[in-house]
Amino acid sequence: MNAAGGGSGSQAAGAAGGNSSLSHNALLATASGATTMPMAQLADGWLELESDPGLFTLLLKDFGCHDVQVEEVYDLQKPIESPYGFIFLFRWIEERRARRKIVETTAEIFVKDEEAISSIFFAQQVVPNSCATHALLSVLLNCNENNLQLGDTLSRLKVHTKGMSPENKGLAIGNTPELACAHNSHAMPQARRRLERTGAGVSSCRFTGEAFHFVSFVPINGQLFELDGLKPYPMNHGGWEDSEDWTDKFRRVMAERLGIATGEQDIRFNLMAVVPDRRIAITHKLKMLRTNQAIVSGTLQKLLKADEQGESGNGDSQRPDTPTTLLEPSAFTARDLQSLLKNLDTEIAINEQHLADENDRRHMFKVDASRRTHNYDKFICTFLSMLAHQGVLGELVSQHLLPSKKVSGQGAANRISKQSTTASAGGSTAGASAATPKTQQQQAAAAKNGKSPSKTPGRRRKGRNKCRKRK
């Protein structure tokens, strides 16, 4: 599902910045080395993005986080390997009854303790259309740094915003040049035209009655948190059992949430998982398999060589000592090692194909991004102008319009013919039904007089007239 997720700020970024004690120079310092941009252009120039895992993966790379990817989740029950967090895209309708039920449910789990809020990265969305970046950062900046390499930009942002209020963290995100440029570089041209029509600083989502909004679900200190930039506080859904994974708790929360949200048959939502780059795990597994392949192959060669020497009687017939190998030669026969080597070759081929598939996916992400962000307006206008200049545009338009007219004319003729046929058939049927009772009475009278009912009285009269003429 590719829905544009815009989201709305709780207030204009400029107004929020005026009330904030955080200086604009400090905000721009989070992106050292970046080109200076007007503050209004940074805060009010964010564009809507589509909900696409390929787009989000490339956006993470542009942020400087290279070892992460985003995958779309189609089945909640299917296990997901080592997710950092989940991003939930849902249809936002302020006045919807199901929305009020969700608000009433989540209000009970708000975390209002300032110390607890400052210990996690929770940013309020004060900049319109930035909820996609907010959702990604809510996952990445709450992960353990030992498991994830954030890159220079996100690392500086995390350090700089430590201890800030959620509002100031939202301003820091909206006024970081690298984040704004990376975000807008993946927007469609229609989003830019829509922003120019509505005007900067005016939300195109929340206050128009309907939108699509992103929220994040991440595990923090043994608790499942829901981070929504349009909410005043983060939400704590509680912990999970010792025998469970945090994704089991997430599945239960999502099942309940979707059950409430789909009460009015509205199932427009999308779920994505932020996971480690699959290519890293595949590459590591390939390296291990190739190492084992070399060990098994070397051990097999030594074993075959020792057997040949034993059979010829030349040299020592004892098995070779291979302390550098992981396999003990005496525990395996040559046939066992050959079978093991064959299995390793198969596993290597399978993982090489998986790695090639992942690389092809990344290539297609870039191709789709080029198609998505390219502005085709100039090409289309130039192409149509050239056709008009050559005098063939009108002919092409007529050729494409005539078939539809012919089809509509044929359809009308078929309808008239069908109506005429139906009317004729109806008249014949009425006449036959009117004559049927008289014919039945004549046949009944003939049967009563002992005469054959096969001939009608009219035919007998004709026969008598012919006889009289002959006489």
From Swiss-Prot:
InterPro entries listed in its UniProt record: Papain-like_cys_pep_sf, Peptidase_C12_UCH, Peptidase_C12_UCH_sf, UCH_C
The entry's keywords: Chromatin regulator, Hydrolase, Nucleus, Protease, Thiol protease, Ubl conjugation pathway
Enzyme Commission designation: 3.4.19.12
Low complexity bias spans: 420-448
Active site: 131 (nucleophile), 213 (proton donor)
GO-annotated cellular components: chromatin; cytoplasm; PR-DUB complex
Basic residues: compositionally biased ranges: 457-471
Subcellular location(s) of the protein: Nucleus
Domain annotation ULD: ranges: 375-403
GO biological process, one term: ubiquitin-dependent protein catabolic process
Annotated spans, Positively charged C-terminal tail required for binding nucleosomes: 405-471
Region (Disordered), start-end ranges: 412-471
Keyword Hydrolase (UniProt): yes
Residues that span the membrane, as ranges: none
Example GO molecular function: chromatin binding
Enzyme class: hydrolase
Swiss-Prot/TrEMBL site (Transition state stabilizer) positions: 125
Subunit structure: Catalytic component of the polycomb repressive deubiquitinase (PR-DUB) complex, at least composed of caly/calypso, Asx and sba (MBD5/6 homolog). The PR-DUB complex associates with nucleosomes to mediate deubiquitination of histone H2AK118ub1 substrates; the association requires the positively charged C-terminal tail of caly, probably due to direct binding of DNA. Interacts (via ULD domain) with Asx (via DEUBAD domain); the interaction produces a stable heterodimer with a composite binding site for ubiquitin.
Function, in words: Catalytic component of the polycomb repressive deubiquitinase (PR-DUB) complex, a complex that specifically mediates deubiquitination of histone H2A monoubiquitinated at 'Lys-119' (H2AK118ub1). Mediates bisymmetric organization of the PR-DUB complex and is involved in association with nucleosomes to mediate deubiquitination. Does not deubiquitinate monoubiquitinated histone H2B. Required to maintain the transcriptionally repressive state of homeotic genes throughout development. The PR-DUB complex has weak or no activity toward 'Lys-48'- and 'Lys-63'-linked polyubiquitin chains.
Family as reported in the entry's similarity comment: Belongs to the peptidase C12 family. BAP1 subfamily.
UniProt-recorded name of the protein: Ubiquitin carboxyl-terminal hydrolase calypso
